[in-house]
Amino acid sequence: IHNQTVAYYRLLDKLRADFPDIEWESCASGGGRIDTGVIEHVQRCWTSDMTDALSRQCIQRWTVQNIAPEYLGAHISQPTSQQTGRTYSVAFRAATAVFHSFGIEWDITKASDADLQELASWIVWYKANRDFLHSGRFVRLDVADPAVLAHGVVAADGSRALIAHVQYE
């Protein structure tokens, strides 16, 4: 397995050198099994095939124990999760993705005009705040209520913070 892994790293390095305008993403192999050594060879890792925004909150909370948030692929998925059948607003799906490598995984040709406008607003917000989100100190807050997750980013100089409070159950 070691030789296969080293060969994979060499392949990624060659692809990055040959195609510098492409961002390469590693797979989590079903979630929770990111090869931490691959970070040196890719721009991000796909965190999990579970794209349900509420489920991703917990997955992402613990994955950032080992991988910096900006390296974790996190996308706004379709309104109704294929895995759980739960439906979420654009705001919740976007708020779940913005702390990480923000993207869109949703057939927006099927989105309403209102959802498209809200999505556009989130994209503008993310672009304006990306440097702060990816250069600050990521924090996980311990909350006594097991149905609540809280995490956020604090600017390096302490001048600013953004905290997410998630009602998990």
Positions of PLM-derived features:
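Short amphipathic alpha-helical patches
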Residues: 38-39, 50, 120-121, 142-153
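A broadly tuned, weak detector of single residues within folded domains
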Residues: 17, 90, 119, 156-157
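A glycine-rich phosphate-binding loop feature that marks nucleotide/adenosyl-phosphate handling sites
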Residues: 26-34, 112-116, 139-147
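Carbohydrate-binding surface patches
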Residues: 143-169
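Catalytic cores of secreted or luminal carbohydrate-active enzymes
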Residues: 91-140
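Generic hydrophobic alpha-helical scaffold/packing signal
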Residues: 9-16, 120-123, 164
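Glycan-recognition surfaces
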Residues: 2-109
